[in-house]
Amino acid sequence: MKANQFGRKGWTPERIENLSRKTFVITGTTSGTGFEAAKILLSKGAKVTMLNRNPKKSENTIHTLKQVLGNDILVSAITMDLSSQASVKKAAELVIANESKIDALICNAAIAQVPKQTFTEDGWESQMGTNHYGNFTLQALLYPLIEKSNGRIVTVGSMGYNLGIKTIQFDDINWDKNYTANGMYSQSKLAQIMSVYELQNRLQAAGKTNVKAYACHPGASKTSLIKTSGSLMTRFIWQIMKLSPLVQSAEKGAYPQLMCATEPKLDQTGFYGPTKNLNTVGPVGAHKLEPHAKDRAVAKRLWDLSEKETGITWNL
């Protein structure tokens, strides 16, 4: 096994330097890893804009963060439903109006284990529409602000990418014929991860080496992801698992995305997360990504389909 480049303890937030005058945009911060990531960034002096679906929860989150860190922190929230292209576009417009640059966009929000096939208002299966198409559009629209600061795009994936079929099911993209909660979640996360490495290829081809794109995952962390969208049985099983040593804290689950957003000279070709117990817990660093997640032909086809479906073209 390859040694962790950050040593025996792996990467930790102690490596983050002062982030004053740095601006971060992060999705899904009202609980779990997103909340912990926002808290740590703010504690280092960063300015943080949170994109969340529920405005009341955003308000409560800001109140909590100020109680912990003080009233002088630079934190704000914009309402955004990642499953709605109209909402994503409106939120992006507000970010562009309020910010002159973005040092890192952290795409943390997701839904998982939706028990029955449901569709977004745009006509896509809900997990694919939220986790993939929603993030694809958000990243494309905010790319100009990220480019201004030679910034980063961080996609929070999942080891679930490797638990389903090993390609994109283009002939039935909404999984009308064989829908399962696990299979569709895996598909959406595979699509997210493939798009990161395809973006890297396109940035390189365009000579835009100043912008970096990273893929990471939180491992098995104590979050509310399954609680908000999984079936009753899935939620019950997860509550039991959270009591075991196979699951780590939400704070530790936030380390991979924080590393990808802040660590200088981090190799963007890596895949980052916990490195023990099948990459579910343990020291954070780079670990193996299965070859099918970097299948260039499939990734290119997915990218072209995503531009067609969303009507969004990246301005590279």
What positions do the PLM features span?
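C-terminal helical subdomain
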Residues: V88, S188, I240-H287, K294-K300, ...
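Pocket-edge positions in alpha/beta enzyme catalytic cores
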Residues: M50, M80, P245, P291-K294
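Rossmann-fold NAD(P)H-dependent dehydrogenase/reductase core
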Residues: M1-M233, K308-L316
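A C-terminal cap/extension of S-adenosyl-L-methionine-dependent methyltransferases
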Residues: R235-Q239
